[in-house]
Amino acid sequence: GGYPILWHIMKIDSHYGFNDFVVLTGYKQEVIKDYFVNYYMANSDVTVDLSTNEVVVHRNHCEPWKVTLFYTGRNCLTAGRIKKAQSIIGNEPFMLTYGDGVGDIDINALIKNHKNSGKICTLTAYQPEGRWGALGIEEDGTVTNFSEKPKESNLWINAGYFVCEPEIFDYIPDDSENIMWEHEPLKNIARDGKLNSYKHSGFWHAMDMLKDKQDLNKMWQENKAPWKIW
């Protein structure tokens, strides 16, 4: 829709009143930095006096965001990026998400679920649609029904929207540049019974491949984007 997917994710959080962001950058960090550094002027009505180089801003259309762009290294994996952000986040609960998926996640419900659980980390669980359509078949071969890509009833995946307590940093070693958050840290949190799940029954879609981008763009252009809750 003409905006980075990161912008869409931030708009979802901002809808619920969360406007303080830390973006952990790596590859193409200069592109992300340029986008936010120039965001104010790109979204303002201005008068430019070319003889004096004076710029007068009449009105801006920016969100009330405070965005910290924190470079964590080109090749650092997810756990290492999170660990490096500890110095910025401090000793407070925080939300964590990947930069490649959008959904109509009820952030308030997610946070409430997390607080009620008493766990140190809550992930958003989502039932994906099946890869193929399913048939209902009688013993004599008669097809009784056909379901187009039904949700897989016994399969839940990590949709990448987390609420974390600062204790999660204890599960990430200092030397963690080659460690994925989803591997040792998250598995060990689960092993210790400290990982909670919030089941999201609405819309969620990752943008892993070109077709995903095309599908999401089509939804946006047709004004049928379920994640546009703002």
Task: List each language-model region with its residue ranges.
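A conditional alpha-helix N-cap/helix-loop micro-motif detector
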Residues: 2-3, 75-78, 179
